[in-house]
From Swiss-Prot:
Residues holding Zn(2+) 1: C60, C62, C75, C78
Gene Ontology CC, one term: DNA-directed RNA polymerase complex
SUPFAM superfamilies: beta and beta-prime subunits of DNA dependent RNA-polymerase
Similarity annotation: Belongs to the RNA polymerase beta' chain family.
Upper taxonomic lineage: Bacteria, Pseudomonadati, Spirochaetota, Spirochaetia, Spirochaetales
Catalytic activity: RNA(n) + a ribonucleoside 5'-triphosphate = RNA(n+1) + diphosphate
PANTHER family associated with the record: DNA-DIRECTED RNA POLYMERASE (PTHR19376), DNA-DIRECTED RNA POLYMERASE SUBUNIT BETA (PTHR19376:SF54)
Protein name per its UniProtKB record: DNA-directed RNA polymerase subunit beta'
Binding site for Mg(2+): D449, D451, D453
Statement: the UniProt record of this protein carries the keyword Zinc: yes
Species assigned in the record: Borrelia hermsii (strain HS1 / DAH)
Length: 1377
């Protein structure tokens, strides 16, 4: 065999009959396997030694030649070659079939490949192959048509009429003849002409046929090879027969399937020799076809062949498919030697790079090393003796083991391994007992706890593997999370509590207010018990007295020397930022030292503090009753409104839920306030939550406040909350509601974990071949990034989005003009600070989305590697890291729901508009009318505001140094005050002088308003921070009259488009527009003037509640109808994970919106077939049609001006529309924002570039729109780079290039469409992928990771890249003379 490492490509083709014969070492003629008396293989049977090789090493079957010296000799008596028995793993046989048989992969799988080539439907093809119908092969001079199907009677009739002047036949022979007669070139040009004729109306079948024909032409496969005359028999060791204890045999299912084929084949051969009647022969041929089908794919047939125990037999295809198939079970994941597993316990005494391995386990794992050392030390002279010494566990063995494991790393892995930090290397330390000891700080990366978790240990054997473990996988080299660059090794629970206690301040304790000259004096005073840890003291640091506490001095004293004095109470968040800061300033070695000190101090002082909780620590606020009574009063008022018919049932429900949410929030705030004051902040429950050691505000609320609203099984919120808390105890009904929530949490967790795991698998599959391959792709494109804001609040600063990327443009300081950032320069933390000081908050950076590297991405576009904060190395497998970064939190989040126990988490909706800081109203957008109490927005609107960042009274100013509207930055002189001091700006913004005030204001911002908002301020007003400027109804969207006049109903017919319901609770009549669609009816309300002329009309969507009567007078601002918002549901990542799934799979959402295809003016047209036609007239007067389902709530009205991409009705956006209307860049931004939104809501931080890598893979293909002079087919989907290559070639030859449009493909589909057939086959739909690949003669270039793992090569990333493989180490021989 060819050396497994020296090929670079692998190809798959259909085997011809000659090829199968050339593989074979002989024909299998009998169906026997083993002679049950002698237990030797039968001659010419399925295990025959003459064909497949000897079963005994270097011995022939009859025993005439018995020794290695006869190697290669073929025995003259039994014809068996003297060889090694391992040849039985590689030698194949064959079966000569008595009648041709079609291969099930090519005729049965949809679309049927043979059917497409011959243009026969699958059902017709089946009836020919199973000998039910004849097909005309040559019609001769009859009036039959070629390829016409005839049944038995028709065939006999034609035979009588025309005699032998035509030929028709059935079975695989007929199909074989037809395939042999095909002229592919002629067929191809015929189909291409048809496609040109049909143009846009091309059906998919034409495209499929053309693709298959082109594939056959290019690959050199012949169509008739899909019909088999010879059947290969796989080597016997791969379908073994094993003797069990009771003398019975267990055999592979394949042997049974082969036996059936051989038996039927032999029977058919006899029947043919005997010239048996046609009907019998035909039946036998059909049975042969069936048995070969079962052999190749038993699960795909309607009648599955079953074995002895009535279970379906496992055929060749089944052996490849699925999780238990060859690919996933044996090639992508293997069980490995030198490994063990055990329960983990905490090892507080370990260093960060160590783990404790039980001595017994270590001895077993390192056995070969120990044996070698024993022999080297001449204690023993053979392996057998060494093994017995090890079994006796003599002292010498333990000494040797100690030496062996020194500096020999081991890998620890915890399942599920969701990201690369699930396997890390440690130096082993021998421990007593049987449990593995794990360092407490690495638990977070493993997501491990010590409640019975198990971990696996692996020993890297070769020096290269050990070196990689030390250099790359050691726990001390993996301090940062590759997903976002934040530390992943940080303290939690006990350690945090200990340090929080140590660094807290307490009033009136021993030693308060004392002064100390240095740290040593403080420590001495503590040891002498004359100073309390929590006492506030003054210590001299760098010649100055600093107010701090004794505990903080203890903490700082222990830290490594370089770190500046940390003077604050340390919570988990503070500790994480301290670790981050130290990492950036001092590097990893100091951090590692610091982490072990933090662990040690934390545990020590947690023990000293010895916190316990009792019932008296749970303090229920006395004001609870007041809050609950107030809520009940508000609810009575809401109920009253409902009874009067002012609000609908849905609004009532939403308002009630909102009241309880607010009450719960207020009560919680009060409770936390009380707990904080209790015992000077040393209330243990409060300390645990505040330090972040355990528990949360939400859990304390349930202990001491009220449990709050609960969710039903459906996810709806039950409007009656649980008012009790756990301290007071729950009533029976409250307890019952609680149990439901708790159970649901656990059930959901189990289901969603599988979901998130599957998401990770698909992500890995699509991105596995994205590797950093080159330094610079030379692109000039980039993406624009800016800080993400929610109104005025910065959700994600520019730093998070831009640090570690490379700039694509040169940025100069607007003041000095010097270059801050040059082209292709890395954006570092310092550069961002510089940009922020001069007021630049937008950047254009290089991104993976715009990278033009042909395979993978380039270093410059990827930027920084977050796992070490350095520029990414060439060879880094960034695709897999991206997939893990997105998949891992998915799984984490799904596991996190049950801790709160099903408590509903819907926020209370606010109905007031107030801004956090002072501002000036600069302008309004949107249709609004003047009413008594201000402005009323009849449709959606926008406020344009400028925030006031700084203000000063002009009277306090002596001399101004700036002009109105001038831009200022930090440090710029503003004015000289009355005392003659220069006042410098501490902000970035613009100067505004208004009403004797000097202000610095921000750039203009937009705040969107809902329809129905009442605004109490006017343009130009200055508004103080926190003032309520407007109100709206959060639970209903009103349709408001914009003119005065009379109401006239149009197409509002009771019983058809209008439904009157008597509300049983209130007795009121509610008028609701039905959501049924009627062809000719379009319910609207017209407003007419005194002369009866229509002024305007309002279209009423389905489910709108009418608020007016026909013929009544109406004023500007009156509500005509309103739409209730759906009731609140609790949202956790269950809402999140399916959403992420849908986005990555690019599924079209259920409740779709229609987007304006172009910018222009809206024109309403009639309803046709249940859809309303809306035209948008563009600037050239061209009409663009949009069809919208009639019941939908429209967001535009007749005559509105819209921009391309604006939503015309409510609903979800379809990503494919975004691509079509707004283009690729907008689509990337849309997907990125939507996916990040789901994760951000859950508090998960993932860097954009990871999601970018996946989106890039989803947009790899383009669809051919015009063929030009290329070989492409209209509507074909091709790889971008293949498209550019071919176009380049055509242009060079002076031809016309093809035109294509970008398309978006979901991750599953994209994984199956990948260039590597090995990778696609090992993902899903194995047989389909292999069928198509074999027809096309696909070549796998082995560029990705999966395909290399499957065939046993080193993966082409990191040290496995060709770039590094060619490195040679030479000794420098030029020594001095």
């Amino acid at each position: 065999m060819k050396e497994i490492k020296d090929f670079e490509k692998i190809r798959i083709k259909i085997a011809s009959r000659d090829q199968i014969r050339s593989w074979s070492y002989g024909e299998v003629k009998k169906s026997e396997t083993i002679n049950y008396r002698t237990l030797r293989p039968e001659k010419d049977g399925l295990f025959c030694e003459r064909i497949f090789g000897t079963t005994k090493e270097w011995e022939c079957y009859c025993g005439k030649f018995k020794s290695i010296r006869y190697k290669g000799i073929i025995c003259d008596r039994c014809n068996v070659e003297v060889t090694h028995f391992k040849v039985r793993r590689e030698r194949m046989g064959h079966i000569e079939l008595s009648a041709p048989v079609a291969h099930i992969w090519y005729y049965k799988y949809i679309p049927s490949r043979i059917g497409l080539l011959l243009d026969i439907t699958a059902s017709n093809l089946n009836s020919i192959l199973y000998y039910e119908k004849y097909i005309v092969i040559e019609p001769g001079d009859t009036d039959l048509k070629k390829m016409q199907l005839l049944n038995e009677d028709e065939y006999s009739e034609a035979k009588e009429r025309y005699g032998m002047s035509f030929s028709a036949s059935m079975g695989a022979e007929a199909i074989k003849t037809l395939l042999e007669n095909l002229d592919l070139d002629e067929l191809s040009s015929k189909l291409r002409l048809q496609m040109i004729d049909k143009d846009d109306k091309t059906d998919k079948k034409l495209l499929r046929r053309l693709e298959i024909i082109e594939n056959f032409k290019v690959s050199g496969n012949k169509p008739e090879w899909m019909i088999m005359d010879v059947l290969p028999v796989i080597p016997p060791e791969i379908r073994p027969m094993v003797q069990l204890d009771g003398g019975r045999f267990a055999t592979s299912d394949l042997n049974d399937l082969y036996r059936r084929v051989i038996n039927r084949n032999n029977r058919l051969r006899k029947l043919l020799l005997l010239n048996a009647p046609e009907i019998i022969v035909r039946n036998e041929k059909r049975m042969l076809q069936e048995s070969v089908d079962s052999l190749f794919d038993n699960s795909h047939k309607r009648k599955v062949v079953k074995g002895t125990s009535n279970r379906p037999l496992k055929s060749l295809s089944d052996a490849l498919k699925g999780k238990q198939g060859r690919f996933r079970q044996n090639l992508l994941g293997k069980r490995v030697d030198y490994s063990g597993r055990s329960v983990i316990v905490v090892g507080p005494e370990l260093k960060l790079h160590q783990c404790g391995i039980p001595a017994k386990m270590a001895l077993e794992l390192f056995k070969p090393f120990v044996i070698r050392k024993l022999i080297e030390s001449e204690s023993v002279f053979n392996i057998k003796r060494a093994k017995s010494l090890i079994e006796q566990e003599v002292d010498e063995v333990w000494q040797i083991l100690d030496n062996v494991i020194k500096e020999h790393p081991v890998l620890l892995n915890r399942a599920p391994t969701l990201h690369r930090l699930g396997i890390q290397a440690f130096e082993p330390v021998l421990v007593e007992g049987k449990a593995i000891k794990l360092h407490p700080l690495v638990c977070h990366a493993y997501n491990a706890d010590f409640d019975g978790d198990q971990m696996a240990v692996h020993v890297p054997l070769t020096p290269a593997a050990q070196a990689e473990s030390w250099a790359l996988m050691l726990s001390t080299n993996n301090l940062l999370n590759p997903a976002n660059g934040h530390p992943i090794v940080f303290p939690s629970q006990d350690i945090v509590l200990g340090l929080y206690y140590l660094t807290m301040e307490r009033k009136n304790v021993v030693g308060e207010g004392r002064k100390f000259a240095n740290f040593n004096h403080v420590l001495l005073a503590i040891n002498n018990k004359s100073l309390d840890y929590n006492a506030q003291i003054y210590v001299k640091i760098d010649g100055e007295y600093i107010a701090t506490t004794a505990g903080r001095v203890v903490f700082n004293e222990a830290l490594p020397g370089k770190i500046t004095f940390v003077n604050k109470t340390l919570s988990d968040y503070e500790l994480q930022s301290l670790i981050s800061e130290v990492y950036v300033i001092y590097g990893s070695s100091i951090v590692i030292e610091m982490l072990d000190i933090i662990k040690e101090l934390g545990f020590r002082y947690a023990t000293k503090f010895g916190c316990t909780i009792s019932m008296s620590d749970i303090i229920v606020p006395e004001e609870k009753k007041i809050y609950v009574d107030k809520a009940n009063r508000e609810i009575a008022k809401i109920q009253n409104d409902y009874t009067k018919g002012v609000i609908t049932g849905e609004e009532r429900y939403n308002n009630v839920v909102s009241v309880w949410s607010k009450t719960n929030e207020e009560l919680t705030n009060k409770m936390m306030e009380i707990l904080k004051k209790d015992r000077d902040g040393f209330n243990v429950i409060y300390m645990m939550a505040d330090s972040g050691a355990r528990g949360s505000r939400n859990q304390i609320r349930q202990l001491a406040g009220m449990r709050g609203l609960m969710a039903k099984t459906s996810g709806d919120i039950i409007e009656l909350p649980i008012i009790s808390n756990f301290k007071e105890g729950l009533s029976v009904i409250e307890f019952f509601i609680s149990t439901n929530g708790a159970r649901k949490g656990l059930a959901d967790t189990a289901l969603k974990t599988a979901d998130a795991g599957y998401l990770t698998r698909r992500l890995v599959d699509i991105a596995q071949d994205v590797v950093v391959r080159i330094e610079d792709c030379g692109t000039i494109n980039g993406i624009k990034v800016e800080a993400l804001k929610n109104g005025e609040e910065i959700v994600e600063p520019l730093r998070e989005k831009a640090v570690g990327s490379y700039s694509i443009e040169r940025i100069k300081s607007p003041i000095t003009g010097e270059i801050i950032l040059d082209v292709n320069e890395e954006v570092t933390e310092d550069k961002i600070k510089l940009l922020e000081t001069v007021g630049i908050d937008k950047l254009v950076i290089r991104s993976v989305l715009t990278c033009e590297a042909e395979h993978g991405v380039c270093q410059k576009c990827y930027g920084r590697d977050f796992s070490n904060n350095k520029p990414v190395n060439i060879g880094e497998a960034v695709g897999i890291i991206a997939a893990q970064s997105i998949g891992q939190p998915g799984t984490q989040l799904t596991m996190r729901t049950f801790h709160i126990g099903g408590v509903a988490q819907a926020g209370s909706e606010d109905d007031k508009i107030a801004l956090k800081n002072a501002f000036i109203l600069n302008g309004l957008e949107g249709f609004n009318v003047q009413v008594d109490d201000g402005l009323l927005f009849t449709r959606k609107g926008t406020l344009k505001v400028i925030n006031v960042i700084y203000e000063e009274n002009i009277k306090e100013i002596k001399e101004l140094k700036v002009l109105d509207s001038q831009k200022v930055i930090k440090g710029m002189p503003l004015f000289i005050n009355k005392n003659g001091i220069d006042v410098l700006s501490t902000h970035i913004g613009y100067v505004k002088i208004k009403d004797d005030k000097l202000m610095i204001v921000s750039e203009e911002q937009e705040i969107s308003l809902k329809a129905g908002t009442r605004l109490e301020i006017n343009v130009g007003d200055y508004v103080e921070a926190g003032r309520v400027i407007g109100t709206f109804d959060p639970f209903a969207e009103p349709i408001i009259a914009e003119f005065k006049g009379k109401v006239k109903f149009k197409d509002i017919i009771l019983g058809t488009t209008l439904k009157e319901e008597i509300n049983l609770e209130t007795g009121n009549i509610e008028k609701r527009i039905t959501d049924q669609v009627f062809e000719s009816l379009d319910p609207r309300i017209l407003i007419i003037n005194d002369r009866g002329v229509e002024i305007t009309s309002y279209v009423l969507p389905g489910d709108a509640y009418l608020q007016v009567e026909d013929g009544q007078d109406i004023n500007i601002g009156d509500v005509i109808a309103k739409l209730s918002k759906g009731s609140e549901k609790t949202q956790d990542i269950t809402g999140g994970l399916p959403r992420v799934n849908d986005l990555f799979e690019t599924r079209i959402p259920k409740n779709l919106t229609e987007m304006a295809k172009v910018s222009g003016i809206v024109q309403f047209k009639a309803i046709q077939k249940g859809k309303r036609l809306i035209n948008v007239l563009d600037e050239y007067g061209v009409e663009h049609k949009h069809y919208i389902p009639a019941g939908k709530h429209l967001l535009v009205r007749d005559g509105d001006v819209v921009k391309a991409g604006d939503m015309l009705c409510d609903g979800r956006i379809n990503p494919h529309d975004v691509l079509e209307i707004l283009g690729g860049i907008s689509l990337q931004e849309f997907l990125l924002a939507e996916i990040q939104d789901v994760y951000r809501k859950q508090g998960v931080s993932i860097n954009d570039k990871h999601i970018g890598v996946i989106i890039k893979q989803m947009m790899k293909k383009v669809k051919i729109v015009s063929v030009g002079d290329t070989n492409f087919v209209y509507n074909q989907k091709v790889d971008k780079h293949a498209f550019y290559e071919q176009n380049k070639r055509v242009i060079e030859q002076g031809g016309e290039p093809a035109v294509a449009s970008p398309i978006l493909i979901g991750i599953t589909k994209a994984s199956l469409n990948i260039d590597s057939f090995i990778s696609a086959a090992s993902f899903q739909e194995t047989t389909k992928v292999l069928t198509d690949a074999s027809i096309a003669g696909s070549v796998d270039d082995l560029k990705g990771l999966k395909e290399n793992v499957v065939i046993g090569h080193l993966i082409p990333t990191g040290t496995g890249m060709n770039l590094y493989k060619r490195v040679k180490v030479r000794e420098n021989s030029s020594s001095e003379v």
